[in-house]
Swiss-Prot record:
It comes from Chloroflexus aurantiacus (strain ATCC 29366 / DSM 635 / J-10-fl). Induction: Expression is probably regulated by riboflavin, via an FMN riboswitch. PROSITE patterns: PROKAR_LIPOPROTEIN (PS51257). Residues 1-19 form the signal peptide. The gene is ribY. It comes from the Bacteria. It is found in: Cell membrane. Part of an ABC transporter complex that transports riboflavin into the cell. Binds riboflavin. This is Riboflavin-binding protein RibY.
Amino acid sequence: MMKLRVLTLGILIILLITACSAPTPTTPAAAPTAAPAPNAQPTLQQVTLAMSYIPNIQFAPYYVAAAKGYYAAEGIEVVFDYNFENDVLQRAATWPTSGVAFATTSGTSVLLARQQGLPVKTVMTLYQRFPIAFFAKSNVPLASVNDLRGQTIGIPGRFGESFYALLAALYAGGMSEADVTVQEIGFTQTAAVMEDKVPVAIGYAMNEPVQLRGQGVEVNVLLAADVFNLAANGIAVSEALIAQNPELVRKFVRASLRGLADTLANPDEAFDLSLQFIPEAQLGDLSLQRQVLQESLPFWQNELTAQYGLGYTDGQLWTRTEEFMRAAGLLSAPVDVQQAFTNEFVPGGSY
């Protein structure tokens, strides 16, 4: 009887051990797998965009392209480098030594640079209309170029886009500097007009007039582009970059134009995205800056961009610009305009 109990107890223990060690039929064991590999991030090619001004809402299309990942989608990471216009062209011209692949600059500056032997070329135009304006208080007539005759006109100095706009207006109106009084006032145009130090001043159409209106001053504005349009701002690169890495140029332009299209379609979103690239100390009045962006939009598109696509460069405009610059003495010799720009990288342009 005792042996039977011991035997029975032993069998129960064996059954219990077997049951505990058996796999649960409702939860099959998974096959062993390797540890998941971390998501591999693509390596982005870093390129520098030399910008001819301080961080500013006028660069919104490039900021939007960066913020929305359009550059990254093309495999590039853009570094924004701020400096002066002459310097950015010099640096772009000496790529790859300078490390600057792209530069924001005007068509007038490209023509001047090429006369000096710098092998630079515009590959994308942002401003289809020259963004300079003559402005005055509302009691000063400013309906046409003829209203400039006999006026005192305040300009920052005899250099840069404002000076070129003045010379172009006089050229278009059949006048010379003898027909006006030019007063160099530095970059104080807004205050100079508000305080009646000069009746007329020249500045950026989306800047000084907007500031005056924001302070309750009614202004008359004469757009330089309505008098004599000039080749304006876009992206310039060296001929060496085009020859050695045209695909990089194509990628940068394509991403930038996506940013431009989004900015035009949704300027409020573009403004908000741009704020992360502009130091707070340089922002100033946000409502004013928002208006600056809004005023910029019409300058970035026209009937040619509707036909050929955003970023298109108008060859006829460049030809007229070169002819004016020679007549005004800004260029001492002819410049081959067809070598100064290309539309090959602009979708819709000539390939």
